[in-house]
Amino acid sequence: MANIELRAMGDEDWGEVASLIYDSTNAWYVARGRPPIFAGPKDGPILFCAVYEQLDPGCCVVAEDRDANRLAGSCFYHPRSTHVSLGIMNVHPDYFGQGVASQLLRYVTEVADRQRKPMRLVSSALNLDSYSLYNRVGFVPRAIYHDMIQK
């Protein structure tokens, strides 16, 4: 298992986080027989870093593989007056199934616990990997929304 250290995302991490979002999201779609959703330069998702850092400064945790000197995962979170909302979480395909997402989720859960606030998230029930992770750590469906896309 990798030597993972959790820490706050710094400005110097934006490019690697963008590439991580690009790679992990595309890998998830391709593994399910769908085309990648990101195309073009791997730094395209840097927009997530810019927007979320402006909205909630300092509220992204990264999982760094200290031995490989690279990021294994990232998770944005959004403290609000009544709750902490879980944002975009990504794990690099090389680290799928190694507990990185669980570590990131535990970190954000501890943030919410320290603030004495509940956690909330919106997630697709069709994403069984995420649904399973969230269910294992105690999240339960509260409301169901029907979502459709145009083909």
Positions of PLM-derived features:
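A short beta-loop-alpha structural element at the N-terminal edge
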Residues: 5-19
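Active-site rim helix/loop that mediates acceptor-substrate recognition in acyltransferases
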Residues: 18-60, 66, 71
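Conserved beta-strand in the GNAT
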Residues: 60-62, 69-78, 85-90
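Active-site acidic-Proline motif in GNAT/NAT acetyltransferases
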Residues: 79, 92-94, 98, 126
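Conserved GNAT acetyl-CoA-binding A-motif
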Residues: 86-87, 112-126
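Conserved acetyl-CoA-binding loop-helix of GNAT-fold acetyltransferases
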Residues: 91, 97-110, 131-136
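Conserved catalytic-core motifs of GNAT/GCN5-like acyltransferases
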Residues: 118-123, 140-151
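Internal alpha/beta loop-helix hairpins
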Residues: 127-145
